[in-house]
Each structure stands twice: as structure tokens, then as C-alpha cells.
UniProtKB/Swiss-Prot annotation:
PANTHER family found in the cross-reference section: CHORISMATE SYNTHASE
Comment on bound cofactor: Reduced FMN (FMNH(2)).
Protein name as catalogued: Chorismate synthase
Family statement: Belongs to the chorismate synthase family.
Keywords recorded for this protein, A-Z: Amino-acid biosynthesis, Aromatic amino acid biosynthesis, FAD, Flavoprotein, FMN, Lyase, NADP
Organism: Sodalis glossinidius (strain morsitans)
Residues binding NADP(+), per UniProt: R48, R54
Residues bound to FMN: R125, S126, S127, N238, A239, G278, K293, P294, T295, S296, S297, R319
Cofactors demanded by this protein: FMNH2
Gene: aroC
One annotated Gene Ontology cellular component of this protein: cytosol
Length: 361
């Protein structure tokens, strides 16, 4: 199976399945001498961890990460960092009744068509359970970026269904289970999740992720543009069906006189481009918006077929998120950090000696 790695200078490889014995990862390219311990990774893993609130899946995984290699006496050695997270709360029997069915909206059918077989237990490799290891690797990138140049990567729930959450207060994001910066939305979000659980249904979501204090100059023309790599990484997250950088599709209705980010001696006067021009960071905040589909694992009966070619109706039982967008926030942060770390190291390798006068204050 190809496609399990991302990055060039900072390279992350993951392995493992939803109901396998463990999830694993290998992180290459971390410079030596960086203080690193398991607790540095655990904070973000706990933010993504299932079973932590009544708004998400009730699968209870401690998600305690183990650093197997690449760290000695509390600092990175420059060699590959091996990571492992044990799976402890699998209930594979929940899926035995549907092992011959193709769940509508899931990867069951496409995996079977590609490989001729599939792991039906929770989706196997296609499950969002795999993203735990991305978050662990992303935590390494976030720490390095923060220490080296003060870069901060953070995200929030921007929309759930028809509920739009404004960016009113970043400090509120870590104070509620929705990662929502708008306290005025919390009651409506709670009511929506309650209604979805009662109906056995799910809902889509929008997530925004932002990188602040990023230096100008990151990104490689032409095919490795920073925004292209970010879109690639963010689209690889389970359930993501759309990615916008900056104003995204809203630019369709704008004129050039509105959309261009004018520059004065005091700096850029707007950020419609989302911090990236010509595929290279401008020094402004890098902003990405994600659209996540509603999970197809719901209690509402749906039509499908089985392996024998019979038309059937099925209900997907098990423990699932009524809105996957909630726990997608730390995952999106991790993927953005992984891409930024990769480009930071690439820039340092090629252009470390470049000194460009910046006329912008």
C-alpha cells in the first residue's frame, strides 16, 4: 500500500488500522538537539482523543503515545523518531453483522475494488483513527516551529450545519468541547448535537486553521507551492471534501481592485490571499478553511448492496461522532504544521544565506 507518507525534508509515515493492535508512525528530518518528551505530544493527542465529551464518539482510547527512538537524554538525536499508540477499546463485534455489506458513503466498496479484500472492522486503514498518529507527528512540528521562529498554529470550529461561529475570542477555543471561539453559539451547538443523536443522524462542519508569525519566503514554485502542499495535506484528512486558502471561492465574485492585498510601508492592508502569494508565504497569517462531510455511520437505514450483489438496507451500528468536524480541529492543526515544518527545512537548506531587504515595517 503506497501513499502512507507526506513531506520531503520533514517526512511523516503512519501505519495501523482502527481495530488493529496499535497505530505507529515514523518521523524523519527532525533536527538534533530539540528537547522532546512524550508529554509534548500528549497534549494535542488528548484534544483529539475519542470519548472525552458527550459530543463525540464514546470509544474510549487513552491514546498514550510512546517514543520508541530518535530521542536520547531528553533531546532529539537527528535520527528517525518512532512513535506508537496502542489500541485498547476495539469492539470489532459491532461490525461482524455488516462484514459483507458495503456501507454507503464509506470506503468499503472502493477499498474492495482496489485491493480485492478489506478490513471491515471500523473501516480499517480508512478510519479516522489513523489520524491520531498525524497529531502526534504534528505536535513535534508545532513545537519546533514555535521555538525556531515563534510560529503558532491553531484552529477552531467555524461552522456546524447552519450554525456559523465567529472568531470572537481565541481563548474560548480551549474552554469548550466544540473548539468554538464564539460562546454565543455553544447553546445552539449543544442542541444540534442532542437532536442529531436522538435522530441517529450526523451533520457536516467547517474548520478554520491559522498559522501566525510565519516568515516570508516559504514555498517552492511551481508544483510544490505552499498552498498546493497545504491543500494536499488538508484534503488527506478523513471526511474533508473541500479546502480554501484565504478567501477561497469567495474571490469569484470580487473585482481585482477589491481582492488584491495592497501594500504600504506599514504592511499589507488586507489578507484575501490567506498569507500566500505565488505559492510563497508573504509573512501574513496563513489561513485555510476546510469543509467536512457528515459521517455516513448513522442509525438511519440506507440502501446498499452486499458482496453477493443483493440489494439490502442497513444501519451502521457502533460508536461514531455525530459531527466529525469537532475532533478535526487538532488534526487540521497537525497537518498544517507538518507542511510548514517541511517547507521551513527546505527553505533553510536552499536559501539560508539569502538576505532580502524588507521595505515593509
Amino acid at each position: 500500500m503506497a501513499g502512507n507518507s507526506i513531506g520531503q525534508f520533514f517526512r511523516v509515515t503512519t501505519f495501523g488500522e482502527s481495530h488493529g493492535s496499535a497505530l505507529g508512525g515514523i518521523v524523519d528530518g527532525v533536527p538534533p538537539g530539540i528537547p522532546l518528551c512524550e508529554e509534548d505530544l500528549q497534549h494535542d493527542l488528548d484534544r483529539r482523543r475519542p470519548g472525552t465529551s458527550r459530543y463525540t464518539t464514546q470509544r474510549r482510547e487513552p491514546d498514550r503515545v510512546k517514543i520508541l527512538s530518535g530521542v536520547f537524554e531528553g533531546v532529539t538525536t537527528g535520527t528517525s523518531i518512532g512513535l506508537l499508540i496502542d489500541n485498547t477499546d476495539q469492539r470489532s463485534q459491532d461490525y461482524s453483522a455488516i462484514k459483507d455489506f458495503y456501507r454507503p458513503g464509506h470506503a468499503d466498496y472502493t477499498y474492495a475494488q482496489k485491493y480485492g479484500r478489506r478490513d471491515y472492522r471500523g473501516g480499517g486503514r480508512s478510519s479516522a483513527r489513523e489520524t491520531a498518529m498525524r497529531v502526534a507527528a504534528g505536535a513535534i512540528a508545532k513545537k519546533y516551529l514555535a521555538q525556531q521562529c515563534g510560529v503558532r498554529v491553531r484552529g477552531y470550529l467555524a461552522q456546524m450545519g447552519d450554525i456559523h461561529c465567529e472568531l470572537k475570542d481565541w481563548t474560548q477555543v480551549e474552554k469548550n468541547s466544540f473548539f468554538c471561539p464564539d460562546v454565543d453559539c455553544l447553546e445552539a451547538l449543544d442542541a444540534l448535537i442532542h437532536d442529531l443523536k436522538k435522530a441517529g443522524d450526523s451533520i457536516g462542519a467547517g474548520v478554520t486553521v491559522v498559522a501566525e508569525n510565519l516568515p516570508a519566503g516559504l514555498g517552492e514554485p511551481v508544483f510544490d507551492r505552499l498552498d498546493a502542499d497545504l491543500a494536499h495535506a488538508l484534503m488527506s484528512i478523513n471526511a474533508v471534501k473541500g479546502v480554501e486558502i484565504g478567501d477561497g471561492f469567495a474571490v469569484i465574485g470580487k473585482r481585482g481592485s477589491e481582492n488584491r492585498d495592497e501594500i504600504t510601508l506599514e504592511g499589507f492592508q488586507s489578507n484575501h490571499a490567506g498569507g500566500i502569494l505565488g505559492g510563497i508565504s508573504s509573512g501574513q497569517p496563513v489561513i485555510a478553511h476546510l469543509a467536512l462531510k457528515p459521517t455516513s455511520s448513522i442509525m438511519v437505514p440506507g440502501r446498499t448492496v452486499n458482496r453477493s450483489g443483493d440489494a439490502v438496507e442497513m444501519v451502521t451500528r457502533g460508536r461514531h461522532d455525530p459531527c466529525v468536524g469537532i475532533r478535526a480541529v487538532p488534526i487540521a492543526e497537525a497537518m498544517m504544521a507538518i507542511v510548514l515544518m517541511d517547507h521551513f527545512l527546505r527553505q533553510r537548506a536552499q536559501c539560508a544565506d539569502v538576505v532580502a531587504a524588507a521595505p515593509i515595517r
